């Protein structure tokens, strides 16, 4: 998601000004008294990224009239958790690239990548305790527990061709939807928004997070390395079989199992068989999984009183879907 496109979707100038302040705060909070740790901990911050989760926190912060500094700190807290989890993910996956640069575990080593991830997670908790209060600290801790559960389940099913879409949904709910939901909830809470608005935007974000991950998994199979910042089809190479692959497995189990085995063994180059997972039939079935979450996310958004925020939330859903597969038929905006 390019920043220019996001700016068109979120035409609220103060949010982008706050995002600049958030970036400065992110650097401040991730700094250590040890320059070496600071360099490693800020490596992925410097590499860029969409900052989607803190943007959601800032957007949710517009639902109330709370302290702007607290709203920014809410965004920093969720981004620190996201960044810390990326450091750990790259060690788990033995990744070589992240955000278009050499991954931290390869630039330094796995031990330092784990320690830097731990440091960012600790700083998130410290910031939340100082700025946001006990309820927010508990929410962040609970969210990270869900993230770990999702990641554990993903590792459990690595290279496993016998698990199905139900397991996949549990994985992405833990790994992705939980933190996007918390981003919205934390931002709304920090703004002193009323409880109804907190609930509505949290529900929107939960389903948006599922949409986000499914569309990202489609992109992994249909986009190029320059766009992704990592090799196309990287999930398959790492033994992570996402929704399109699981659908293909269900339709032609023996054929797809052999293809995946041959790719894993190096007998077949992935790009020669990737069309088995990103053709129109597979994408159309993936779209059916999106449909329920699009409807639930948009129903939640429609309950938000602020019309400008409501329309931005609807447009964010549409953008995520359109960017992954341009000819998906999208629901009409109310």
Where in the sequence are the language-model features?
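Flexible, glycine/charged-enriched surface loops at secondary-structure junctions
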Residues: 304-312
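Acidic, proline/serine/threonine- and glycine-rich low-complexity intrinsically disordered segments
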Residues: 322-324
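Mobile late-domain/C-terminal helix-loop "cap" segments
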Residues: 256-301
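Mg2+-dependent prenyl diphosphate-binding active-site environment of isoprenoid biosynthetic enzymes
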Residues: 16-21, 27-257, 264, 292, ...
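Conserved small/polar residues in nucleotide/adenosyl-binding loops
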Residues: 326-332
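Short, charged, low-complexity loops and linkers
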Residues: 2-8, 102-104, 160-167, 272-280
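N-terminal amphipathic/basic leader segments beginning at the initiator methionine
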Residues: 2-25
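Hydrophobic, well-ordered secondary-structure elements that form the walls
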Residues: 245, 297, 313
């Amino acid at each position: 998601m390019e920043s220019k496109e996001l700016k068109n979707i979120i035409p609220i100038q103060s949010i982008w000004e706050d995002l600049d302040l958030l970036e400065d705060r992110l650097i401040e909070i991730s700094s250590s008294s040890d320059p070496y740790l600071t360099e490693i901990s800020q490596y992925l911050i410097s590499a860029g990224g969409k900052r989607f989760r803190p943007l959601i926190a800032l957007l949710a912060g517009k639902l109330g009239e709370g302290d702007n500094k607290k709203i920014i700190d809410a965004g920093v807290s969720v981004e620190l958790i996201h960044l810390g989890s990326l450091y750990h993910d790259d060690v788990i996956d033995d990744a070589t690239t992240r955000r278009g640069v050499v991954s931290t575990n390869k630039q330094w080593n796995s031990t330092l990548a784990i320690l830097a991830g731990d440091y960012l997670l600790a700083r998130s908790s410290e910031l939340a305790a100082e700025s946001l209060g006990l309820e927010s600290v508990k929410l962040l801790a609970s969210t990270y527990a869900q993230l770990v559960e999702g990641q554990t389940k993903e590792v459990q099913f690595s290279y496993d061709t016998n698990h199905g879409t139900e397991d996949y949904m549990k994985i992405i709910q833990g790994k992705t939807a939980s933190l996007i939901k918390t981003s919205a909830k934390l931002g709304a809470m920090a703004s002193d928004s009323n409880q109804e608005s907190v609930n509505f935007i949290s529900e929107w974000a939960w389903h948006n997070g599922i949409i986000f991950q499914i569309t990202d998994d489609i992109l992994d199979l249909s986009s190029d390395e320059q766009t992704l910042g990592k090799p196309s089809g990287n999930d398959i190479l790492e033994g992570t079989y996402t929704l399109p692959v699981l659908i293909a497995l269900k339709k032609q189990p023996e054929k797809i199992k052999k293809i995946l085995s041959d790719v894993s063994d190096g007998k077949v180059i992935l790009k020669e068989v990737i069309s088995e997972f990103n053709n129109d039939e597979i994408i159309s079935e993936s779209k059916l999984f999106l449909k329920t979450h699009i409807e639930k996310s948009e129903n939640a958004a429609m309950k938000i009183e602020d019309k400008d925020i409501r329309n931005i939330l609807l447009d964010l859903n549409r953008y995520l879907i359109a960017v992954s597969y341009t000819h998906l038929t999208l629901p009409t905006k109310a």
